[in-house]
């Protein structure tokens, strides 16, 4: 990627920036001149390279690329400058790799699903639909953790929000989703319900996927969101719908929670991992609370030693991991964990 950048612009990427885009940036408001045909090809090439980076694990730039890819047909000079910044950010943090943690997250302090009476609600008493033709489960069970978020009026021209969902197997992120919503919501409450519907769809997919692979799945999925009003409306049978046009998402989320295997809980925004999939985040706060605990990064290998018995690297006194917890129980301490690094 860096060599292609050098070929296009005859210079190395500027690596002074510590985030993909400036916090609170709105590229749709850019009024700089349009690019010519040759520059458009370069712009599309940069977007394609960045999308490839996302597919191999660099989802910290996904919100920026989701936004910038909308302008591929007619990009402006300011859009090209923003893409150059994203490439510079990737080159600056080129050592970022996903940490693979295979031990179970500690949710001992997390409250369980409240014993609400869903049987006498409109959803009735029903359980999870488990595939009958799945192979018998073998091996260590997997605990699934999901984070979801919505960014209201991400695009100020259309008023549309962005949905962000991230799924963890044990303590490892394996699936990330970032997409602009198709409708313009008038309140965060409605945008969060659309994101809640998406995370429920993801839960169904991942649990079925693991069962068909023959892996035992934990009887409960942990789902974290930062809009308490939406979560209360979803988890309490007596709650009322505040926005009628969200009625389908409202009933879908509540019907899934009534099955008893989704534990949807509130979490502070600064610990919500899906926040980086919905907003143009800044370095301060976001990097240390969300980015650093998930990615292996240059300079943290001093805390690693090679354990010949495990044949993997083991982290000692990993403060970033202790901060992570896996973000759900908010700063719960972790035991030293096995780490395997991939690109």
Model-assigned labels for residue ranges:
Residues 1-109, 268, 277:
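C-terminal reverse transcriptase regions that engage the nucleic-acid substrate
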Residues 2, 27, 50, 58, ...:
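Mobile genetic element proteins and their domesticated derivatives, centered on retroelements
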Residues 36-37, 129-134, 150-154, 182, ...:
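Eukaryotic intrinsically disordered and solvent-exposed regulatory patches
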Residues 50, 138-190:
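RNase H-like nuclease fold core
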Residues 54, 90-97, 117-122, 151-155, ...:
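Alpha-helix capping/termination and helix-coil
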Residues 71-74, 143, 182-343:
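RNase H-like nuclease module associated with reverse transcription
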Residues 72-73, 106-108, 153-156, 174-175, ...:
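Flexible loop/turn segments at secondary-structure boundaries
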Residues 88-150, 215:
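Structured nucleic-acid-interacting core domains from mobile-element enzymes and related host factors
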